[in-house]
Amino acid sequence: MKVANDYEKRDNNSYYVDHGSEGTNITRDNDGFFEETAAEIAEPYRAADRSNDQDNDRSGGNVNEGRGIGYIALALSIISLFVLPVLLGAAGIIVGYIARRRGAQGLGAWAMGIGVVSLVLGIFIIPFF
């Protein structure tokens, strides 16, 4: 039994592996190259495939997903012009941002804009009257 070197070269493409009791003859037809590669080598990853996966996750029915949240945000912002401007204005900004993230771009932007106006009026201008 060999301890330091398990592979004993016999000829150009033939190896003898000694595992103790019996040996195994390994023949390789690789034109003189003796490198071993692992079976875990995967094909290269392309980042462009990932955008296609994300498009498939969202179907056409979810386009109006944030519209209800957008209307709620707009209502909060408009009500904040008359009642509790700091509290409802901040709520309108936060809910408007959530609506924008969910696809209601216009409603979310209007809710955030009106909420900012109401917040500025409530903090800086109304206390002086």
UniProtKB/Swiss-Prot annotation:
Membrane topology: Multi-pass membrane protein
Region Disordered, annotated ranges: 44-63
Location, primary (coarse class): membrane
Localization (cell): Cell membrane
Record's keyword terms, sorted: Cell membrane, Membrane, Transmembrane, Transmembrane helix
Listed GO CC annotations: plasma membrane
Keyword Membrane set for record: yes
Ranges annotated as spanning the membrane: 78-98, 109-129
Keyword hit for Transferase: no
Biased composition (Basic and acidic residues): 46-58
Protein name listed in UniProt: Uncharacterized protein YqfX
Biological source species: Bacillus subtilis (strain 168)
Organism phylogeny: Bacteria, Bacillati, Bacillota, Bacilli, Bacillales
Encoding gene, per UniProt annotation: yqfX
